[in-house]
Every structure is written in structure tokens, then in C-alpha cells.
Amino acid sequence: MFRFTEIEKTLCMDRTRDCAVRFHVYLQSLDLGSSDPHSPDFDGLAYLRDECLTKHPSLGDSNSDARRKELAYAKLMDSDQRCKIQNSNGYDYSHIESGV
């Protein structure tokens, strides 16, 4: 992962291409049952919409888009640096038993 393309940066940081956001918007448009697991008209997709996807950083009261992009870029750079170190030093297999 020495280099990554502009497309990869865009996919990582562009909110309009964020799959979770698009999926959440799609689920919001559906007429679903109750998200309460104890309700007789419980719907798993409603639960997913109300409980899981609302925890997405761009859907709640979390980081701004600018801060989110900054954090995503920092995470990419950190990952890239770790890959460079592993590629230059090789992988450490000392924890694996040789007889296996």
C-alpha cells in the first residue's frame, strides 16, 4: 500500500459516496415495522436503521465532515506507514511453531 490512487482517497473521504449513508437514506424511505425487538411487528431492517446505522459518524451528532475526512486521511497514512515497515522488514513468523 505504498501508494493509493485518487479514487481510493475519494471513496474513503467523500461523504456522497459513503455506502452506509446511502443505505441509511434508502432504509429511511422504506415503510418498515417496529425496531423494538419485543414488538409483535418487529422488523429487522427497522432495527438496523434505528439502532446500528444511526451510530455512523456522519449520521449522528459526531464529527463534522471536515474532521471526518481529516481522521480518515490520518488513518490511511498510518496504515500506509505500517505497510511500508512490514514490507521493508518482512513479516515476523517467530510466533508460529515450525513443526505445524
Swiss-Prot record:
The organism's place on the tree of life at top rank: Viruses
GO biological process, one term: viral RNA genome replication
Record InterPro entries: RNArep_beta (IPR005093)
Keyword Transferase: yes
Reactions performed catalytically: RNA(n) + a ribonucleoside 5'-triphosphate = RNA(n+1) + diphosphate
Complexes and interactors: The polymerase complex is composed of four chains, the three other proteins of the complex (alpha, gamma, and delta chains) are supplied by the host cell.
Role: This enzyme is part of the viral RNA-dependent RNA polymerase complex.
UniProt-recorded name of the protein: RNA-directed RNA polymerase beta chain
The species this protein was found in: Enterobacteria phage JP34
